[in-house]
Amino acid sequence: MKGLRKLLLVLGVMLLATGVALAAGGEAASGEHHYDWTNLGFRLANFAIFIAIIYYAAGKKLIAFFGGRRKGIEQELNDLETRKTDAKKQLGDVEKRIADLENERKAIIAEYQAQGEALKAAIISKAETSARQIVEQAKKSAENEVKYAKDAMREELADMIVDATEKLLKERLDGKEQEKLIDKYLTKVVLN
């Protein structure tokens, strides 16, 4: 009902404005055509009826559509404002990270240098340990080789001494002296 009042008010204002505009044109000169007010009245009435039918048939839907559209636009504006605020915050974070990037780079370099030094020290320590083990193993191998060589030389020398002694004894001792020596040693063994 309130909408119908507005519609009638608008139509009345349009009718008056049209009448005033036509009246301002002045008196019609002789032979000139006079304006047909009846035609204008029918046209305005036709227009008013058309608007009334549209309002009656789809008024609530149009109001709901434009009201819903208004709410949708308000919601979209609020969402855009929220996104704008979030974007400003993210931009601030990115700018802060960019500002801290040099410090972060220095920290990363320092960390990797420390890791590199630790790795270098570990490698050097392992290499020194391996070198000591190799030297000790070489010393043991050399000592074993020397011991083996000494034992081989002693064995060979003992064999040579035994051979030389046998030869010397065979040359100096004859059968009688051999029997005397055997008897002498057997007597010592039996007495002891």
Swiss-Prot record:
Cell location: Cell inner membrane
Key words, A-Z: ATP synthesis, Cell inner membrane, Cell membrane, CF(0), Hydrogen ion transport, Ion transport, Membrane, Transmembrane, Transmembrane helix, Transport
GO function term, MF aspect, one: proton-transporting ATPase activity, rotational mechanism
Domain of life: Bacteria
This protein's GO CC annotations: plasma membrane; proton-transporting ATP synthase complex
UniProt key word Ion transport: yes
Statement: the UniProt record of this protein carries the keyword Phosphoprotein: no
Transmembrane segments: 7-27
Entry-linked HAMAP family: ATP_synth_b_bprime
Function: F(1)F(0) ATP synthase produces ATP from ADP in the presence of a proton or sodium gradient. F-type ATPases consist of two structural domains, F(1) containing the extramembraneous catalytic core and F(0) containing the membrane proton channel, linked together by a central stalk and a peripheral stalk. During catalysis, ATP synthesis in the catalytic domain of F(1) is coupled via a rotary mechanism of the central stalk subunits to proton translocation. Component of the F(0) channel, it forms part of the peripheral stalk, linking F(1) to F(0).
Family the UniProt entry places it in: Belongs to the ATPase B chain family.
Subunit structure: F-type ATPases have 2 components, F(1) - the catalytic core - and F(0) - the membrane proton channel. F(1) has five subunits: alpha(3), beta(3), gamma(1), delta(1), epsilon(1). F(0) has three main subunits: a(1), b(2) and c(10-14). The alpha and beta chains form an alternating ring which encloses part of the gamma chain. F(1) is attached to F(0) by a central stalk formed by the gamma and epsilon chains, while a peripheral stalk is formed by the delta and b chains.
This protein's name: ATP synthase subunit b
Organism field: Oleidesulfovibrio alaskensis (strain ATCC BAA-1058 / DSM 17464 / G20) (Desulfovibrio alaskensis)
